[in-house]
């Protein structure tokens, strides 16, 4: 892995080359897995007054099997002032682009996103400012006659209080094209939603208090269509901390999905408590539990971190995943350790 970085004033250029190649002989590895090489350039820029900023990149991958569309490229531009904010992004990823040392969510797509924010500064005792933010996003498949896979028109209305609390009202009108059948409830025997395009407008209202306080909370309710049915949601997050030794939080979300017959209807729960301890500047312990009634799964993750030298850590991680209806039969149980040392 090699990098070459050059920064001048408010511009920065990064040229990189990453090589992953098989060592030794193994009949279990096919030709495409023998090696993977990615090279490219990233270019970042910013104006002197910091109102304008942006970046562009071009990456290309090389494998044993030659591909014509093994690229990933994009550009984004941001303008931000006291009253206005504009952000635009364009990304194109070829179907043949591969990066073994990274995660590529979707390939063979063209994506565009644009957002405009207008801020109004209010001279009142409690309100700091009000903002209205319309946005538009769409994703197409160029190799399928530019078939629209996702499209979303949305508008957000926010009130920011001087207490640092926030009230947000969001309306969105998304469109999704399902290129394969989708079992929403994931129940055995449930009839999946068929292939096709779906519009499902929805409305969300959320409120959070001052996140600098020792006790913080966030609540959100939502309602709208969901593919060929409806969905009503509620979400809450509660957090408490005793600086600098203790932090805990609880995430709860519930989605009530109603689909027309013969499709299934379900109430989906997700509960996730988290507890973190900081014993000193070198020893940390974090614990995370998650329960979901999708598959009746219960997961436990516990990680102990020891920073024995600057930027050098030893991790001991315990994972346990259960079927909640029978906690004595673990699905996955593991104990892992990781050592990193900075020379």
Could you describe each region identified by the protein language model?
Residues 34-36, 48-343:
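Exposed, low-structure sequence patches enriched in small/polar residues
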Residues 1-45:
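Aromatic-lined, polymer-binding surfaces characteristic
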């Amino acid at each position: 892995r090699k990098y070459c970085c050059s920064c001048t004033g408010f511009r920065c250029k990064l040229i990189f080359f990453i090589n992953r190649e098989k060592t030794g002989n193994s009949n279990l590895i096919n030709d495409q897995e023998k090696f993977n090489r990615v090279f490219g350039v990233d270019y970042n820029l910013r104006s002197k007054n910091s109102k304008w900023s942006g970046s562009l990149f071009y990456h290309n991958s090389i494998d044993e099997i030659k591909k014509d569309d093994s690229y990933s490229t994009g550009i984004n531009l941001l303008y931000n002032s006291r009253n206005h904010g504009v952000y635009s992004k364009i990304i194109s990823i070829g179907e043949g682009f591969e990066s073994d040392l990274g995660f590529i969510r979707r390939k063979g797509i063209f994506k565009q996103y644009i957002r405009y924010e207008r801020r109004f500064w209010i001279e009142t005792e409690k309100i700091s400012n009000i903002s209205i933010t319309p946005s538009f996003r769409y994703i197409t498949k160029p190799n399928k006659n530019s078939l629209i896979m996702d499209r979303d028109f949305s508008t957000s209305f926010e009130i920011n209080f001087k207490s640092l609390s926030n009230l947000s009202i969001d309306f969105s009108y998304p469109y999704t094209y399902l290129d394969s059948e989708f079992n929403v409830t994931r129940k055995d025997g449930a009839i999946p939603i068929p292939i096709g395009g779906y519009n499902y407008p929805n409305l969300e209202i959320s409120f959070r208090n001052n996140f600098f306080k020792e006790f913080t909370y966030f609540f959100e309710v939502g309602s709208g269509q969901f593919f060929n049915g409806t969905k009503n949601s509620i979400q809450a997050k509660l957090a408490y901390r005793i600086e600098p030794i203790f932090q805990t939080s609880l995430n709860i979300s519930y989605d009530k999905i109603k689909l027309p017959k013969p499709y299934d209807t379900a109430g989906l729960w997700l509960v996730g408590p988290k507890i973190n301890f900081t014993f000193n500047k070198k020893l940390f312990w974090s614990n995370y539990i998650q329960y979901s009634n999708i598959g009746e799964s219960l997961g436990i993750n516990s990680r102990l971190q020891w920073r024995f030298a600057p930027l050098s850590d030893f991790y001991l991680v315990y994972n346990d995943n259960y079927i909640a209806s029978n906690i004595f039969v673990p699905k996955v149980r593991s104990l892992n350790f990781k050592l990193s040392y900075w020379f």
